[in-house]
């Protein structure tokens, strides 16, 4: 793609070469602008999930293109194997994997992080001498997201709403306890309880028929 004539501009400001100081500052700024990456926005091209339920990596193409001296945008290459973060501490996690087409915010690390892989908990030497390189970025979140269709909404009025159109499964190896200060309501066309024994305390009110063998 190419910028319009109105948007084209030189990289050197007026007066950059007016003094030795200005020329030096221009050279320093050029190094910072071209070699030091901080945070940037990209689009996910592909995702490789981690083994088991661990997080994985994604290939991401930057959405802001570099430009040449004529103001023309340059083709941007996909940056491979960027690790993505998730909400997790210890063994507790909220698992949501990125998908191709997601627009994500990435942060470039100071050093080469290629030696810091899954399971690494001790400091490692940098994988190379590169600094602030986009190849050493970490995906920290999504931006300009789509309208979600499955979600958990936590509101400031102390309520939680869960929407899962395709199904909802709660699995545990221990007991499940529901505590409510009011009525617990279950609305469904059919409710099945698969248990060898059902125990109830208190009164049982039934509107309708009770069938059994």
Where are these regions (language model features)?
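Low-complexity, small-hydrophobic/phenylalanine-enriched stretches
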Residues: 154, 160-163, 168-172, 176-178, ...
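Hydrophobic packing positions characteristic
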Residues: 2-180
């Amino acid at each position: 793609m190419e910028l319009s004539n109105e948007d084209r501009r030189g990289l050197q400001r007026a007066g950059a070469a007016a003094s030795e100081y200005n020329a030096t500052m221009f050279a320093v700024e050029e190094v910072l602008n071209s070699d030091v990456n901080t945070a940037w926005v990209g689009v996910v091209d592909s995702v490789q999930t981690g083994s088991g339920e661990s997080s994985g990596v994604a290939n991401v193409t930057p959405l802001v293109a570099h430009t040449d001296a004529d103001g023309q945008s340059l083709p941007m290459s996909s940056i491979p194997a960027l690790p993505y973060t998730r909400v997790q501490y210890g063994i507790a996690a909220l698992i949501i994997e990125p998908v191709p087409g997601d627009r994500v915010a990435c942060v470039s690390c100071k050093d080469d992080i290629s030696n810091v892989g899954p399971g690494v908990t001790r400091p490692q030497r940098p994988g190379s001498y590169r600094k602030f390189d986009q190849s050493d970025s970490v995906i920290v979140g999504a931006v300009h997201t789509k309208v979600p269709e499955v979600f958990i909404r936590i509101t400031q009025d102390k309520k939680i709403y869960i929407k899962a159109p395709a199904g909802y499964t709660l699995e545990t190896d221990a007991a499940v306890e529901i505590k409510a200060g009011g009525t617990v309501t279950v609305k469904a066309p059919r409710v099945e309880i698969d248990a060898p024994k059902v125990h109830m305390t208190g009164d049982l009110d039934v509107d309708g028929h009770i069938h059994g063998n």
